[in-house]
Amino acid sequence: MTTLHPIIGVAANERRDAGDDMGHMAISYNPSGYIKAVQLVGGLPIMIPIGDPMNAKRYISMIDKLVLAGGQNVAPEFYGEVETIKSNDYNRERDAFEIALINEAIKQNKPIVGVCRGMQLVNVALGGSLNQ
């Protein structure tokens, strides 16, 4: 008898300072700890690269659960504030895309696991605020 493993979408991060060996191309990645954890509990992990928020519905329809990993700070404009602390540690494209994933996962009644930044982003997507 074959048991189907749940498909777990792990939202990717992006490294933009890849260096000369990659020709200054951005690299999409998931930290291996997230992938191993999903596998350890019997899930089949797939990476969801940062992209157009309009594609969130399609991505979420392909998975059983969504994992949002840690990473950069959430940009203040997503929780209704003006940036008071200047930082290069924002990825607004990622913020917008993952908020779309969260909203769509809620619409499709798919479970969401947020770790660190991921949990902060769930809070923001649901109308919450953060301290800068």
Where are these regions (language model features)?
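N-terminal beta1-alpha1 cap of cysteine-dependent amidohydrolase-like domains
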Residues: 1-115, 123-126, 131
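Catalytic nucleophile loop
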Residues: 119
